[in-house]
Each structure stands twice: as C-alpha cells, then as structure tokens.
Amino acid sequence: MRNRDLRPAVKANPTIQQAFERFQKYNRLKNLSQGSLDFYAAKGRSFFRFLGDTEQPIHTITEETVEDYIFYMEDQQLHDTTINTNLRMVRAFLYWCMEKGYLEQFSIKLVRADDPIKEPYTTDELQRLLKEPDCKTCSFAEYRNWVIVNFLLGTGCRASTLLNLQIGDLDLSAGTVFFRHMKARNQQIVPLSKALVKIMEEYLEHRTSDPTAPLFVSEYGNQMTLNSLGNAVWNYNHSRGVDKTSMHLFRHTYAKLYIQAGGDPFRLQKLLGHADLTMTRRYVALYADDLRANYDALNPLEQLTRINRHGDKIKMGKGEGK
C-alpha cells in the first residue's frame, strides 16, 4: 500500500497581508491576550518592512526568504536573542500558513544564541531597597514604591499582573492574592509570605475600602500605567543608590533565591505562572549550583525582611493615597 502524504495541498493563495490578517483573526478566536496580539503585530511589521511588498501572494515566501531575513537582521547588528524573538513570530505565522495549505512545508530554525544571564539584584541592593522608609518624612509615593518593590520580590509577579490588581484581590486573612491578569490569560491564587501580609495590612490602612479599586495608584489616586510604574521603580531604586531599575529583574531575583533555598522547580513553575517547565529549567540551570544550606524559608522576601519592624506608622493627609 502506497504511503499517503497527509500534508495539505497548497491552495489558491491570498496575499501576504491578507494571510496575516487571517492569522490574527485566528489568534483572536484562540482568545490570545492583547499583549500577544500586539507582539505578533509589532514583529509582523518588522518582517513586512523587510519584504517590502505585502500585496504579493503568500506562496512567494520560501525557506530562502526566511534565511535572507536572518541575514538582513544580522546586517542590522541585532542581538541573537532579538533575531530569535522576531523569528518566533515569523515561524508561528508561516507554520500556520503551511497548516492552511498556503505554503509548501519547510522548517524554520532559530539561530544559535548564548542565553544572556541577567544579573539579579544582589543582597546588598535588596537590603537598600527593602529598608523601610522614614515614617516621619516619607511621601505616599515613596511609601507606595517601597510596598511595590516588596510585592514584586515577595510574589515574583509580572508588572502587568501587579498593575491589574484590585484591593479585593487580597485575602490577607488567608494569606493569598488572586492574580486575575497573567501573560497567558490564566488566573491563579498565590500565597503571600508573613512579611508581605504585614506590609500589605499597613498599606491598606492608607487606601480606600472599595474592593474594586486598583491596589496601586498614583499620588492622586489614579490607575497607574506600565510607564508610570516603570518610572516609579526607576526613581525609587536610584534614590536608594541602586543602578538596576528593571521591574522584571525582581522576578528573576525571586526565582534565583527560591532555587538557591532548595525550592521545588515544579512549585516554582506554578508560582510564576509558567505554562511549562522551560523557563523554570533555565533558572535551575543557572542557580541550582549555588544552594545555601542556611536558608530556612523558600520565599525570598521572608529571608530578607525583618518581620518585627519598628517605628511609627506613616501619617497620611486626609484623602492622600485614596
């Protein structure tokens, strides 16, 4: 019996632009997050600038086209990781076109790249950042930024997740927080350390009791944006003498300290909201050889924060921080 080729035959082709619009429609039907849709759109524009004419039939794209795109990006002196980020979009798009029968089958491989090791925050830097602000002179903004840094380190959450938190998402009696907005549209309940529960209890004393209000707001009570959050962390870190200002670096630091404390990679995967163990394995490969026998808790904030803090609570003016 002759083996059948089960690959779809190449169909009458749409243009490149039409195919991409159908691809994005497919992604919306899959209920991809807006962040993912924006990612595909941005990387698509980069690929289309290289192609020049997106009104030509999609079947004109070949394996050689992709190879030329790689050379084009290399000529622009893009980093290997950036090239691979662009290629992942191209691969997802063109593989979908192959499944639809718009293209002949061919393989798209990423370029070899050394994974850059992002240096996490050091213990000295964390001690500076986690030092409680002067309760007599501190503004709401500085206090809020201190709470934000504690929250990022204490949960390992993404900045986008933090921005979408509502006051009602905290259940401090149970010691948990509900993450309603995550990268892959997942939602999950994450435990909070004792140190972070105490910090959040005090922070909520200066906030409104409305459970639907944003957890972290501007000095005027407005919803923070990703840009304003980034600026807040940038200013706060520099005010503490720390040059590193990446919000995502708190996530890497959380993972590093968790692994070094002997934490279970499978549990770390769940805590960080990763769809699989790929990223968690990278953390283990980077940090597992650095285990410290004297760590007595898995949560990094618990290791670095004194639970019994002293000093007067911050005095807020009427309506400030509400």
Identify the residue ranges that each predicted region occupies.
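Conserved catalytic core of the tyrosine transesterase superfamily
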Residues: 1-322
